[in-house]
């Protein structure tokens, strides 16, 4: 229920560029920052794991795709972002990079470049009637606004999840002791670093 309400209310519309969708005579879509949209799946990612987070991300993507982006890739995009976020905050590797990714704020902000890449990919394949250069121009012209909107959502969700993870640290991220990261277990990496 929270995912439905969060995905549909409290949004800010950013107008992107004057470029419409290639081949369609319509107003440029822009990007919408739905402030609470990522909050349900980030909290589910920390408390319940990747499958629950992906389910809520897919539900959020379905609602956003229908009401906002009008793009099927939104469903897959947000489901994948939710699953990756859950994997980041629930992994138990001990190196500094993985310790940073265990923090919800860092994990959520690290998803922004990946989301932009997925947007460029989906915008490129969303309209097949236009030429390759028109589709690439449209995708790259709107990537900045997409990054701004998704970055705002992830900043808010990451801050809330950071507070929740500090307040309920026993329930957040699963149980288990820290283990060596893949780089620490690699004989090649250990040989090169001299340990």
Predicted regions and their residues:
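Alpha-helical transmembrane segments and their helix-entry boundary regions
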Residues: 41-45, 53-57, 75, 103
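Short, solvent-exposed segments of well-ordered alpha helices
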Residues: 27-30, 42, 46
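Alpha-helical transmembrane segments
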Residues: 1-10, 50-58, 107-111
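Membrane-embedded alpha-helical hairpins and interfacial helices in multi-pass inner-membrane proteins
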Residues: 8-36, 64-195
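Interfacial segments of multi-pass membrane proteins
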Residues: 48-49, 60-67
């Amino acid at each position: 229920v929270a995912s439905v309400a969060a995905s549909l209310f409290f949004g800010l519309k950013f107008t992107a560029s004057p470029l419409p969708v290639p081949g369609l005579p319509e107003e440029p879509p822009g990007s919408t920052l739905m402030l609470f949209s990522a909050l349900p799946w980030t909290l589910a990612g920390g408390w319940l794991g990747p499958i629950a987070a992906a389910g809520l991300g897919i539900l959020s993507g379905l609602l956003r795709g229908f009401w906002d982006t009008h793009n099927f890739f939104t469903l897959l995009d947000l489901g994948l972002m939710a699953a990756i976020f859950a994997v980041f905050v629930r992994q138990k590797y001990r190196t500094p990079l993985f310790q940073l990714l265990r923090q919800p704020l860092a994990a959520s902000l690290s998803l922004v470049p990946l989301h932009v890449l997925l947007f460029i990919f989906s915008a490129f394949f969303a309209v097949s009637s236009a030429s390759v250069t028109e589709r690439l121009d449209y995708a790259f012209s709107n990537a900045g606004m997409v990054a701004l909107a998704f970055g705002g959502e992830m900043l808010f969700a990451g801050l809330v999840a950071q507070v929740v993870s500090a307040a309920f640290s026993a329930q957040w991220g699963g149980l288990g002791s820290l283990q060596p990261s893949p780089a620490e277990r690699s004989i090649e990496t250990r040989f090169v670093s001299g340990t």
